[in-house]
Amino acid sequence: MSNLALVEICKGLIGTWKLVSYTSKPAGKDGPIEYPLGKDARGYIIYTADGYMSAQIMRPGSKPYSTMDPFAIADDEAADAARHYLAYTGPFEVIEHEGKVTVKHHANLALVPNWAGNHQLRFCELKGNELVLMPTQPWKLNGVLVNQCLIWRKA
């Protein structure tokens, strides 16, 4: 794939995308499609022209905190909220990986501490106003290796 083609794909990513679905399926075998943050998960991913991205995904319906002060919440409230939210941000680049168009997200900041300072590789398909992102490797979710798929629509 030419550098020019990768640049054009990068240009197509620029903007705000709203989550349509976030699914997972057991890797390497048949199994049910799961919805890690529920069928009604909500989220946005934003790509900027200067090469940065931000992704936010949540399960609706988290219990409200007992206070509006985010630094005074109880540990159990914080833990519950963290189980229903994924977020990271940093620079991004479009590359070729395993012969496929791939977006490399450099997670400078992340809700999951293990992600900060690392990168996330996502196979990337642009289909009109739809963006499909899939991690390049299976992930372990709740102890099971799964393949994930995130579908976004231009906001």
Label every model-predicted segment.
Residues 1-87, 94-155:
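Lipid interaction determinants
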